[in-house]
Structure formats: C-alpha cells, structure tokens
C-alpha cells in the first residue's frame, strides 16, 4: 500500500480510501494542512507536536501528499499560494477517484483541490462543507442508532427511552435529538420532544439540534424544534447561527420561520459577517433580496470594514450590485484599507460594475443639484414677493386711515356751514311764531314741522362712525361712503328749505 520514495501510487491501488484512512489514522491526522513534512504539526499557539515515528512514512509518501492535498507541503518542496488552487494535471485521475476522501479529510477541499476564499484570501467556508454527521455504528449505542437510522418500531423506542437517558451524549457530544434532527427522522424528534428532552445541548462543534436540522435542510424537524422553544440565536464555534446556515442554503422559507421565532437578523459570525453579508459574499441573490425586504442593515461591516456593496463588487456579482444600488446605498464608504467599492471594481477590472457605479453616481449628482437649485430660487422669489406685499399694505393702510376722516370732516364742515346760514330761522322758531300757533299747533290743523327727517341729520355722525368702522378700506367702499355723504348733505339742505317755507307760511 505504501509507495516508495519519489514514486506515486497508482489509482487502482486506492480502492477504499476510507478503509485506508482508518488504517493510517495518524498519517491522515498529521499530513493535513498543518503538516510540513518534517514530522511536526503546528496546531494552535501552544507549540509544535512532534511525531518522529511518522517521519519515514511521510517522507516515502511526500509526493502523494503534495499532489493530492494542495495545502499539504508533504516533503517541504511544494510552495503554493494562499488560494490553495495549485493543480497537477497528472494527478487529476487519482484526485477524482479520491474526491470523497479529499472532501472529508479537508474541510475546505471539495475534491478539486480548491478552496473558496474571500476578496483578501482570508475567508473559507469550511463551516458549511460537512453539514451531516459522519457516523460509525460502533460509536453509537442503541438509542443513538435508533435516532440516526430511525428503523426501530415506536414501542421499542419508548422502551429504550425508559431504560436510558434521552439526553445522553456520544463521543462527539451528540444526543439522540442531534442525530434524529440531522438525519430527518421526524417521528423520533417528535417522540423526544414529547418526552421533554433538553433542546439546547451543544455537540462538539457547539451546534444545537436546530442548527443541525437547518444546516442539513431538514425543515420539518427544524419547525418542530422552533415550536417547542429552541433558541435560534445560539452560535456554533464558527459564530454562525441557524439563520446563517439557512441563508447559505438559500432556504427562504426556513429563514422566514427563523425570523418569525426571534432569530437575530444582525448576528455576526467570527468573520464579522451578518446573514446579509454572508448572502452577498456567497452570491445568493434571492435571499439577499429577501433580507433587504426584511430591513436588514445595509451599512453592516465585517471585521475588515467591508460593506455589502464592497463584498458584492469583490465577488464580481453585477446583479447584486445593481440590487444594492436600488436601495440608495452609500457608494463612497471605505474599508479599513481605505478603498471604496469603485476602487475594488477598477482593480478587479469589473467593467460592468464600474459602469453601474458611474451611472449611479451621476444620477445622485443630478438629483442633489436639482434639489439644491430650484427650491432656493423659488424661496427667494416668494420671500421677495411677500416682503413687497407687506410693504405695500403697510403704506396703504395709513393713507386710508387718513383719507376717511378727511371725508367725514369735509361733510361735517358743509353741514356746519349750512346750519350757520339757516341758524337764525331755525333757532328763532319759538320767538317769531305767534302765540296761537305755538299754543294751538296740534289743534288748528296747521302744517306741523316734519320731524321724520330731522333725526337723520342728528344721527349722521353716528352712521358715519359706524360706516367708518365697518369699512374694509378699499376703493369701492370709499366711493360708496362719498356718495352717502353727498346724499345726506342734500337731504339736510332740503330739510332747511322746507322749514323756511313753513315759517313763512305761518307768518302770513
């Protein structure tokens, strides 16, 4: 099974990679990304762990390690970039046959020797690569086997629950609820929930049964767990909540249910990604649109200060960029390196995105200029007109106030002059009249003096004052008041003439 130094095993020699991996567990453990071919593995910050017993085996299979696993440096001669996309065409056949082995041995590897990284080469989606549990029958007891395979009659399962602890954990800290939820055995999940098992127990990845159900897209089990009160906001060791996994899987119905049961739409994982940022980074346009409708924060930043727009530009998704621009998002925001979305688009040569950003910026400039220019001019015109109108009203009011008294004064003067002319006759009524006329005025049928119109002359000032106070100070009312004054004066003259005639008749 082991190839000689400098040679590579044939593809036919690797018939059962899982069996080989189980036999060579130590080699698989140390030849992964931490291996440098020197017998030392850099795990954590505490120091190097030496496994000198594996030096010979690793040196003999150095090339195989180097070509099958691009991240592993096996013999120390392979220096690949940070993206981990080094490819050796001679090993394509071997890697294709050992794709499952690569996928399960390396969380970041999908069997093609490539890892999905972010714009800066720092992001990997290893948390999303192995949704289902890897279960070995010998590691499970009866209850866990029944929960995983779900082929046990209900009666037997009830007996198992009576005899054993339903919250018991296996070596990977998984309970029966974890296994049943991850594998979609809704009958077992329902029975465990009816028995009031613990809901928020964490496995070795700090995931709850709800997180595993959502991650494995077992919606029926996930809804049952939500209805019984499972917390949807418990993060796993990667910082992802159940909503992150629903967004990654583009499961809008599950995301809607999680939000309905109180999931935090702004929770961040260890990379500082909210569900919206994760959806943009993974180019999940439908769930991005869904989260925007649910009022997700468009100004959220990851740990490098990148916005959703910058991530969309870096990922080269013109459709998501266009969708974000429709929300009037800020295109001038910078990340921690001081770069904007447009600068990323130019450096990445995304011409379509550059054009979208340029058009959006021009529209914003035109909009701002139109809003700032026209309203100010209108305000200036209206303010000037208002000031002129106020000045005109202030100037016209004193003139009207001064003109009305003059009219009244002129009328009063005319009345006084007429009264002076006829004052002797009017005031001499008691002296010139004979005694009989004065005594028998009402009995002899003499023409009595007309008293019906004298009150009008006496009430003239009152009517003039009332008219003055009720006047609305316009030209038409001025003319009416003048006509009334002249009419009243004529009436007064006629009254005095009639009185003179009456006095003359009485004298004769």
From Swiss-Prot:
Residues 377-392, 406-421 have a biased composition (Basic and acidic residues). Residues 369-487 are annotated as: Disordered. Residues 476-487 have a biased composition (Polar residues). InterPro entries: Ankyrin_repeat_domain, Ankyrin_rpt, Ankyrin_rpt-contain_sf. Pfam families: Ank, Ank_2. ANK repeats lie at residues 172-201, 205-234, 238-267, 271-300, 304-333. Keywords: ANK repeat, Repeat. It comes from the Eukaryota. The keyword Repeat applies. PANTHER family: ANKYRIN REPEAT DOMAIN 36-RELATED (PTHR24147), POTE ANKYRIN DOMAIN FAMILY MEMBER D (PTHR24147:SF66). Belongs to the POTE family. This is Putative POTE ankyrin domain family member M. The lineage of its organism: Eukaryota, Metazoa, Chordata, Craniata, Vertebrata. The gene is POTEM.
